[in-house]
Amino acid sequence: MSILQVSTSSLSSSTLLSISPRKSLSSTKSCRIVRCSVEGTTVTERKVSATSEPLLLRAVKGEVVDRPPVWLMRQAGRYMKSYQTLCEKYPSFRDRSENADLVVEISLQPWKVFKPDGVILFSDILTPLSGMNIPFDIVKGKGPIIFNPPQSAADVAQVREFVPEESVPYVGEALRRLRNEVNNEAAVLGFVGAPFTLSSYVIEGGSSKNFTQIKRLAFSQPKVLHALLQKFTTSMITYIRYQADSGAQAVQIFDSWATELSPVDFEEFSLPYLKQIVEAVKQTHPNLPLILYASGSGGLLERLARTGVDVVSLDWTVDMAEGRDRLGRDIAVQGNVDPGVLFGSKEFITSRIHDTVKKAGRDKHILNLGHGIKVGTPEENVAHFFEVAQEIRY
């Protein structure tokens, strides 16, 4: 057995976790090793030069790394005082997310404080809708609202092909600037919504608790839904390529609502379109890591693996060790600490991080939450999460 050494400033002594070794690829990247003292404990920190690949990308490939890379979904958001202050000046979410200056500023807020290994674009999966002739808004306290949800083949025919250079040039500008700001000290991450999840928002007219409208369409007019799914698929292929060409070093695909489908319906209304996206993107960007997240995906893990993505992001309802076994060792995993854990004590947070890292094993793991950071999460607890994660050594 190999030993994982974890040293944290919150513990009086080092904590040892046993990790079963798994085969890794050798890294050819050169790094400078810096040793510093933290409250009497020597911490070895790997300083990556701006010319070498970020830790997150090397981990996804299965290269030998000192620790798991870490970033958190919704790491830029309402739990941060700096974000709250900015919201007072710019109360509209779309004003904040559709302005390159603000997108860069907000995306970098957690980077400047916590130094995560992934810096994700501040945006929304619904951002492309306006450019597809689907009017929408995001209202504080209500969430997304889709005006005039499509209900027929004629309505779907009015949905336009997405041209990101014309519709969302601020996304490209923000990604280019983020790459320059982060300077390869972390991976710049883009993201898109998956076709079924986007269709769900559009058909339901916003968020939903029971998904009656999308299922009514799926089971009574499947051809209409398939036409909409194909339009979103083609558009998201274009959008991922645009993000990659603008500076994104990995892209996460959110299929948040796919788990509302039964396995057989997932295979009809989600899986083929996810596979189509992955295959098309890999033809033009073969080295771009694609991450897939689907909330509550325990019943679909094997099917998620069939999409061809490089990383599957697990939520907290799946045991990390069991999830790895079910997905297979060729796929990297991300996650999967319960976001609610961040309301606990620092000792509790530390123990859950250690448990997750131990179960994930030594390679091909990105430490993250199983969902986004919750509103009201203490900012100091997020800081502690990053501190503990960054002091882990395999």
Curated annotation (Swiss-Prot):
GO terms for biological process: chlorophyll biosynthetic process; protoporphyrinogen IX biosynthetic process. Gene3D superfamilies: 3.20.20.210. The record marks 124 as: Transition state stabilizer. GO terms for molecular function: uroporphyrinogen decarboxylase activity. Induction: Up-regulated by light. Not regulated by circadian rhythm. PANTHER family: METHYLTETRAHYDROFOLATE:HOMOCYSTEINE METHYLTRANSFERASE RELATED, UROPORPHYRINOGEN DECARBOXYLASE. Homodimer. Belongs to the uroporphyrinogen decarboxylase family. This is Uroporphyrinogen decarboxylase 2, chloroplastic. It comes from Arabidopsis thaliana (Mouse-ear cress). The gene is HEME2.
